[in-house]
Regions:
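DNA-dependent DNA polymerase catalytic subunits
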Residues: 1-213
């Protein structure tokens, strides 16, 4: 292949990957895919651009995304992967997922006072600072989103403050679990809308309307 390329270009052999998943990124128009997962002939995964290799996500979201990729590429079983996601969602709703799995990790990029808008991670950093801890650019913040009303930033606690029965399952399902897998399933033509709590509520309302009709 290299013989047909310009002199300034040369391809290097990385390995043989029998299967892979390529997912488009929001806002990407053409060009190379920014998210992909490959499995080589020895069963080893190579993951680039997915939440499994990024911060700002909880362990449960990272774990389930990697497990879904493994079930699709290693087991060739998308249905098994989908059922697994449904089970994890059920466990979240039943408060069976351990607290340490819903902890969200993020890094403060600048001084707290420099943030014009207060997001959940900034609110958590403010709590940490209020405890007398030093918070500066590069500080790793660990927090949990708990149940309650109001904005998400008003419902965060540090991982050392939160209790097992406090975490907001709905938040993690809608903002962590589903976003971490929906584009993977979309590539396979599998709709994840039924996993959403909003979808479940619509279904319940439709059933009640039909019953009352």
């Amino acid at each position: 292949i290299n013989k047909g390329l310009p002199r300034s270009m040369e391809l290097e052999y990385e390995g043989f990957y029998p299967a892979g998943i390529f997912v488009s990124t929001k806002g990407a128009e053409g060009g190379a895919k920014k998210k992909y997962a490959l499995i080589d002939d020895k069963g080893r995964l190579k993951i680039r651009g997915f939440e499994t290799v990024r911060r700002n996500w909880s362990f449960i979201a990272k774990d389930i995304q990697k497990e879904v990729i493994e079930m699709i590429l290693r087991d060739h079983d998308p249905d098994k992967a989908y059922s697994h996601v449904k089970q994890v969602i059920a466990d979240l709703r039943a408060n069976k997922v351990p607290l340490d799995k819903v902890v969200i990790f993020t890094q403060i990029q600048k001084n707290i006072d420099s943030y014009h808008s207060v997001g959940p991670h900034v609110a958590a950093a403010q709590r940490l600072k209020a405890q007398g801890r030093e918070v500066k650019p590069g500080t790793m913040i660990k927090y949990v989103v708990i149940k309650g009303k109001g904005k998400i930033r008003d419902r965060v606690k540090l991982d050392t403050e939160a209790r097992q029965d406090e975490y907001d399952a709905n938040y993690y399902i809608e903002n962590q679990i589903i976003p971490s897998v929906e584009r993977i399933f979309a590539v396979l033509g599998i709709d994840t809308e039924s996993l959403s709590i909003k979808s479940a509520k619509k279904g319940a309302q439709s059933s009640l309307a039909a019953f009352g009709g």
